[in-house]
């Protein structure tokens, strides 16, 4: 599965904000606000990243799901930079 520039932007945002644990994770809304991407783009990207194991679901924030970057996701970023 190919990853595009907008999708890499999401991984970069998670890594730059140290979202690497279940407790330190971002909601879809937070990712949209920081990355300036649409909600549908963020949701589609997160779904792909979950399948690729680049992100995992963190602790819920109220009723909202949160997500953090995994070691696999960090390795993927290192491989392209």
Swiss-Prot record:
Superkingdom classification of source: Viruses
Key words of the record: DNA-binding, Host cytoplasm, Plasmid partition
GO terms, biological process: plasmid partitioning
GO-annotated molecular function: DNA binding
Chief site of localization: host cell
SUPFAM superfamilies: Winged helix' DNA-binding domain
InterPro entries membership: WH-like_DNA-bd_sf (IPR036388), WH_DNA-bd_sf (IPR036390)
Subcellular location: Host cytoplasm
Gene3D superfamilies, A to Z: Winged helix-like DNA-binding domain superfamily/Winged helix DNA-binding domain
Keyword DNA-binding on entry: yes
Gene Ontology cellular component terms for the protein in this record: host cell cytoplasm
Signal sequence extent: none
Keyword DNA-binding carried by entry: yes
Subunit structure: Monomer; probably dimerizes when bound to DNA. Binds to TubZ when associated with tubC DNA.
Note: This bacteriophage also exists as a circular plasmid prophage in its host.
Purpose: A DNA-binding protein that is part of the type III partition system presumably used to ensure correct segregation of this bacteriophage. Binds to tubC (centromere-like site) DNA upstream of its own gene in a sequence-specific fashion (consensus TTGAC); binds to multiple sites in the tubC region, probably spreading from an initial site. Upon binding to tubC forms flexible loops over about 1 kb of DNA that forms 2 rings, covering tubC and the promoter region. This probably shuts off transcription of the operon. DNA is both bent and untwisted by TubR.
Protein name per the record: DNA-binding protein TubR
Species for this entry: Clostridium botulinum C phage (Clostridium botulinum C bacteriophage)
């Amino acid at each position: 599965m190919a990853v595009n520039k907008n999708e890499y932007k999401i991984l970069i945002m998670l890594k730059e904000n140290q979202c690497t644990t279940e407790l330190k994770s971002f909601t879809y809304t937070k990712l949209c606000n920081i990355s300036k991407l649409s909600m549908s783009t963020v949701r589609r990207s997160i779904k792909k990243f979950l399948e690729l194991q680049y992100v995992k679901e963190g602790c819920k924030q109220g009723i909202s799901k949160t997500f953090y970057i995994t070691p696999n996701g960090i390795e993927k970023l290192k491989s392209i930079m």
